Amino acid sequence: MKNVTHSFVFLAHWPSAGSFGLNTDILATNLINLTVVVGVLIYFGKGVLKDLLDNRKQRILSTIRNSEELRRGTIEQLEKARIRLQKVELEADEYRMNGYSEIEREKANLINATSISLEQLEKSKNETLYFEKQRAMNQVRQRVFQQAVQGALGTLNSCLNTELHFRTIRANISILGAMEWKS
């Protein structure tokens, strides 16, 4: 590359001896000078241009390769992230289902416990009602019995005279006496 640059510098400072030389005045140049300059540029510039284009091509290819590697790495990371997301979603669904089933289980247990408590309360209420009914019936029986006894005593006291009273006592004494003799 240095040789090419030195050649251009050498041609640019070539002494003009009259017949052949490089004319730097573009308006004063002729077709032959232009052809020579273009030919030299093509001959020497072809290698330089090829080197520049090859370097540029290599950089572009290198950039493309790096981009492809980055893209592949990004795709792999994306796939890993998707897999993790699916796993987390499955775990979340599992926790949600376990939570719902736990809630349903607790609900069923609470309903069962409440049902049992209600049954016990109903049984206790029925027993209390039965005992209260029995007590009320016993009180009514007792009052009826007391009234009957008082009525009978009243009737007996009004109907009994002294003679009937003595006769009843003698009959009872004779019954008791007969019982004593048998034993």
Curated annotation (Swiss-Prot):
Q: Does the keyword Ion transport apply?
A: yes
Miscellaneous comment text of the record:
In plastids the F-type ATPase is also known as CF(1)CF(0).
Record-given protein name: ATP synthase subunit b, chloroplastic
Main localization of the protein described in the UniProt heading: plastid
This protein's assembly is summarised as:
F-type ATPases have 2 components, F(1) - the catalytic core - and F(0) - the membrane proton channel. F(1) has five subunits: alpha(3), beta(3), gamma(1), delta(1), epsilon(1). F(0) has four main subunits: a(1), b(1), b'(1) and c(10-14). The alpha and beta chains form an alternating ring which encloses part of the gamma chain. F(1) is attached to F(0) by a central stalk formed by the gamma and epsilon chains, while a peripheral stalk is formed by the delta, b and b' chains.
Q: Name one GO cellular component term.
A: proton-transporting ATP synthase complex
Q: Which keywords has UniProt assigned to this entry?
A: ATP synthesis, ATP-binding, CF(0), Chloroplast, Hydrogen ion transport, Ion transport, Membrane, Nucleotide-binding, Plastid, Thylakoid, Transmembrane, Transmembrane helix, Transport
| Membrane-spanning residues | 27-49
How does it sit in the bilayer?
Single-pass membrane protein
Q: Which domain of life is it from?
A: Eukaryota
Q: Which family does it belong to?
A: Belongs to the ATPase B chain family.
One molecular function GO term is: ATP binding
Q: Which HAMAP family match?
A: ATP_synth_b_bprime (MF_01398)
Where it sits in the cell: the answer is: Plastid, Chloroplast thylakoid membrane
**Per its database record, what is this protein's job?**
F(1)F(0) ATP synthase produces ATP from ADP in the presence of a proton or sodium gradient. F-type ATPases consist of two structural domains, F(1) containing the extramembraneous catalytic core and F(0) containing the membrane proton channel, linked together by a central stalk and a peripheral stalk. During catalysis, ATP synthesis in the catalytic domain of F(1) is coupled via a rotary mechanism of the central stalk subunits to proton translocation.
Instruction: Identify the coding gene.
Output: atpF
Keyword Transmembrane among record annotations: yes
* A matching Pfam family: ATP-synt_B
| InterPro entries (UniProt xref) | ATP_synth_b/b'su_bac/chlpt (IPR002146)
